Amino acid sequence: MRDIGATNLQWSILLIQALVDQGFHRFVISPGSRSTPLALAVARNPKAKYWVVVDERSAAFFALGQSRYTLSSTSPPTPTILICTSGSAVANWLPAVVEANHAALPLLLLSADRPPELHQCGANQTIEQEGLFGVQVRATHPLPPPDEITHPRREITRLLTTLTKQLTLSIPGPIHLNIPFREPLLPLQPEQMNWSAEPFPPLFPPLPPSPLPDTRALGETIHHQAGLILCGEM
C-alpha cells in the first residue's frame, strides 16, 4: 500500500526546495494541521528563512511588509511566501492580499486544503478555497493532491517556470497556490521523515542589479534649477 503521508512530505520538500533554489526563501507560517507537510518542509530546509505568526491576518500583513522591503533591497523584488491550513484560516489573508494587489507587491500564497472528496459534505474547516481571492490575485493555481501526481519533480519544475514568470511581472502582485492533502499527512514509517530533495537548477538567469543613480549630476541639476522633489508611491 502506498504511504500517502510519505508522498505528502516528499512533494512538499520538493516544492520548498524548488522555491528556495529560485531565490524565494522567505516564509511566514501560521501553524495548522493540514499544512503540516509544508511547514515541516520549510523548517527542514537550511536555506529557508521563516517566521511563525499564529494569527493568519497578522501573518499576511507581516509578509506584506517583508515583500515591501525587497522593493528597495533586491532587483527584481522577490515574494514572501505565506503558508496556512485550510478553511477560514485562508480567508484571513484577504485584507493583505487586497493591499498587495493595489500596491503591486509580490506574495505567494500556499494554502493547504482538504481533498476533493471532503468538499460539499460538511467536513470541518472545508470551504471553496479555489478562486477565493477573485480578481485580487494575478493568478490562481489549484493543484491535485500530491498522491495523484505521477511525476512530482517534473510537474513542480513546470509549475515553478510559470510561477517565476508570474512573480516577476512588470506589475507584480499576489499569486495563490491551493494544495489539497489527504491523510495521513505525514509518513507512517519514521525513516521516511529523513527524505531530502536534490537541488533544482535556476530556471532563469539572474537579472543584473539596477544601476545606481548619478547623484552628482542630480545635484548639479538641482543646484541650477528650481524644482520639486516627490517622495513615496505614485
Where are these regions (language model features)?
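N-terminal alpha/beta PP-like core and its mobile active-site loop of ThDP/TPP-dependent enzymes
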Residues: 2-234
